[in-house]
Amino acid sequence: MPGVSAKMPLPMFNRHLLVAGATGTGKTRTLQLLAEGLSANGSSVLLCDVKGDLTGLAEAGASSDKLLSRTAANGQDWASSSFPIELLSLGGANSQFPGVPVRAQISDFGPILLARALSLNTTQEQALQLIFAWADGQGLELIDLPDLRAVISFLTSDEGKDELATIGGVSKATAGVILRALTALESQGGGQFFGAPGFDTADLMRMD
């Protein structure tokens, strides 16, 4: 309808919204327009973009006669523009998916979530909690997987057996299972997620 702009009031954006449709019906374009509108109004937007379709927000679009005639027919006063974006990635600059690395320190991740990631059973999870508790009591900050592996190896060694006794004991068999699970996670690339600095969700609300 010429002269009428279809827009969504900003106060309505705190409600749930579903964008659905068949392939090629404009779902990605709809998300892009929503993000553009929010960015233009000073609101930060977090988009999970697996295929990279939305990275075009960083570049101003190229004009063409066909585009201008279409927008004119729809009553739109179109002008190309770019928007500030920041690419987040699990891999970071040293991987095939460059971007600001999203990381978490082992200490912040915690033993319960890590036990789930490692598919540990209840006994193994409890042992991992004891290991975390000992490290915390010693003031040891577990940053990445090698840090955790070093602590487990120490506690199950001859030098660390006295320390191990103070936390109730962790069998070498259980420690071996945890160490093998850590190695498996690392071989699958999971080690890239752990490191410093840890990701702060407050950064998602940062405005330039």
Predicted regions and their residues:
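Hydrophobic positions on the alpha1 helix immediately C-terminal to the Walker A/P-loop
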Residues: 30, 34
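P-loop NTPase motor domains
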Residues: 35-45, 52-208
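Conserved lysine of the Walker
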Residues: 27
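Short hydrophobic/aromatic beta-strand immediately N-terminal to the Walker A/P-loop
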Residues: 17-18, 46
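The conserved Walker
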Residues: 19-23
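Beta-strand-rich binding-surface signature
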Residues: 5, 16, 84
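Gly-rich Lys/Arg/Thr-decorated short loops/hinges at beta-loop-alpha junctions or inter-strand turns
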Residues: 13-16, 109-110
